[in-house]
């Protein structure tokens, strides 16, 4: 076993996964996590891999690229996906988790590994020696300054937003119904139907509600996948009806008709006592937020246990700075992982940590770092963040559009996606022992 130690900075999804992958390969890890010594504006605990936005890791089927990346990670012994599978809650065709159990499970698996030493302290300078920086969207100011100096480039700022969570007991169950869209999977969502009149009243209140002011020096650049509901509404009333309040496939069993609009609630904990409001990430002040949410049928007396909040997100210009191994181009033993690389989403962040961790371990053992082919979901993400146009670089979720093209064109989308998935999983099996 090598005597060299790899520093991993940040015990979020990417950092926890990276530390585990390094440790299981017989390499010592120093895992630095500043919480609880210093908290961030969005975290509430000292647990690893705390989910600060939704509790859903999105689609769990192979007809979706994020489902494929999960299956690749299962084959590669991902600690994040293992913990998620063990802490899952009902969510139709998605993989959602009890966020508290999930974070506790990841913490247990990583912290208890004999090759992992946890250091609860803030890192303000980039260490010498093999290092993975996985400090995420809320990198502390001191380390951010160091990274700016290192890269010679400014960061890009945007906001991720978290949706409110309500107590199930406070929901008027006479006004809502249990159903998944198009009846896919088990009936996993509580649906709050709206008439056009109810929607109009809600919409007018939403666009008039007061938001928390942004700081002058921060530019508003929202990632489309986690955009505040009031920002979507400001683009026009139909944006909501065709977005998070889309009613298609959600016929009301009481009337047999499709409502004008629907607000969906998704189970947030294993006990089924908490529900989050799907797609309702928001930056509204808490008073106006409560008033607006209580205009939703069934939520008139809702007890809000967590208000929607927003936090800054930060990412580097990876096409200029990184290789598809997640190595920094100017320093072979420095790696980046997680959302700061421009991969967007919980699963994608963990996947980047998995690959960065494997490559950091290989580096200190004198082995060549691995580049996963872009026919795989993980390889396509690494390829996207390092080979796309640097000038217009934006965060991206896993999607089949990033995969290398199929050899033969397939017209039907379902068959095409199945072909992408089959090829990806056949390929990734060649890498399970790296």
From Swiss-Prot:
Subcellular localization: Cytoplasm
Molecular function as annotated in GO: flavin adenine dinucleotide binding; tRNA (uracil(54)-C5)-methyltransferase activity, 5,10-methylenetetrahydrofolate-dependent
Cofactor dependence: FAD
Enzyme class: transferase
PROSITE patterns reported in the protein's UniProt record: GIDA_2
Pfam families reported in the protein's UniProt record: GIDA
Catalytic activity: uridine(54) in tRNA + (6R)-5,10-methylene-5,6,7,8-tetrahydrofolate + NADH + H(+) = 5-methyluridine(54) in tRNA + (6S)-5,6,7,8-tetrahydrofolate + NAD(+); uridine(54) in tRNA + (6R)-5,10-methylene-5,6,7,8-tetrahydrofolate + NADPH + H(+) = 5-methyluridine(54) in tRNA + (6S)-5,6,7,8-tetrahydrofolate + NADP(+)
One of the record's GO cellular component terms: cytosol
EC code(s) of this entry: 2.1.1.74
Ligand binding (FAD): 10-15
Keywords noted in UniProt: Cytoplasm, FAD, Flavoprotein, Methyltransferase, NAD, NADP, Transferase, tRNA processing
Classification via InterPro entries: FAD/NAD-bd_sf (IPR036188), MnmG-rel (IPR002218), MnmG-rel_CS (IPR020595), MnmG_N (IPR040131), TrmFO (IPR004417)
GO biological process: tRNA methylation; tRNA wobble uridine modification
Coarse class of the protein's main subcellular location: cytoplasm
Keyword Methyltransferase in annotation: yes
Family: Belongs to the MnmG family. TrmFO subfamily.
Function field: Catalyzes the folate-dependent formation of 5-methyl-uridine at position 54 (M-5-U54) in all tRNAs.
Name of the protein this chain belongs to: Methylenetetrahydrofolate--tRNA-(uracil-5-)-methyltransferase TrmFO
Organism: Bacillus cereus (strain AH820)
Taxon lineage: Bacteria, Bacillati, Bacillota, Bacilli, Bacillales
């Amino acid at each position: 076993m090598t005597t060299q130690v790899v520093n991993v900075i940040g015990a979020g999804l990417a950092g926890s996964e990276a530390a585990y992958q390094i440790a299981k390969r017989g390499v010592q890890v120093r895992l630095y996590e500043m919480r609880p010594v210093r908290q961030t504006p969005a975290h509430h605990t000292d647990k690893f891999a705390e989910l600060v936005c939704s509790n859903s890791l999105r689609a769990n089927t192979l007809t979706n690229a994020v489902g494929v990346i999960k299956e690749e990670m299962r084959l590669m012994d991902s600690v994040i996906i293992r913990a998620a599978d063990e802490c899952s809650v009902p969510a139709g065709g998605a993989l959602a988790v009890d966020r508290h159990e999930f974070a506790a499970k990841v913490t247990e698996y990583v912290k208890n590994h004999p090759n992992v030493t946890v250091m609860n302290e803030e890192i303000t300078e980039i260490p010498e020696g093999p290092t993975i920086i996985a400090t995420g969207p809320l990198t502390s100011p001191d380390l951010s300054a160091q990274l700016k100096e290192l890269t010679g480039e400014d960061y890009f700022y945007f906001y991720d937003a978290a949706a409110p969570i309500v107590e199930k007991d406070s929901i008027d169950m006479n006004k809502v119904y249990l159903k998944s869209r198009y009846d896919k999977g088990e009936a996993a969502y509580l649906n709050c139907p709206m008439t056009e009149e109810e929607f109009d009243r809600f919409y007018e209140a939403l666009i008039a509600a007061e938001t928390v002011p942004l700081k002058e020096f921060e530019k508003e650049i929202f990632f489309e996948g986690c955009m505040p509901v009031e920002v979507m509404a400001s683009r026009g009333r139909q944006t909501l009806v065709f977005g998070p309040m889309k009613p298609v496939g959600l016929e009301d069993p009481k009337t047999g008709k499709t409502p004008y609009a629907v607000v969906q609630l998704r189970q947030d904990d294993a006990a089924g006592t908490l529900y989050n409001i799907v797609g309702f990430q928001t930056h509204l002040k808490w008073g106006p937020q409560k008033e607006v949410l209580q205009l939703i049928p069934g939520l008139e007396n809702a007890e809000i246990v967590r208000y929607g909040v927003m936090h800054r997100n930060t990412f580097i210009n990876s096409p200029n700075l990184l290789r598809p191994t997640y190595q920094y181009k100017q320093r072979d033993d420095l790696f980046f992982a997680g959302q700061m690389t421009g991969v967007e989403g919980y699963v994608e962040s963990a996947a980047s940590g998995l690959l960065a961790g494997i490559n950091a371990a290989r580096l200190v053992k004198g082995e060549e770092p691995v580049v996963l082919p872009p026919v795989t979901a993980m390889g396509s993400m690494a390829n996207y963040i390092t080979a796309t146009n640097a000038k217009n670089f934006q965060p991206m979720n896993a999607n089949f559009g990033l995969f290398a093209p199929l050899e033969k064109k397939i017209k039907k989308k379902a068959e095409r996606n199945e072909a992408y998935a089959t090829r990806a999983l056949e390929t990734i099996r060649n890498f399970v022992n790296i």
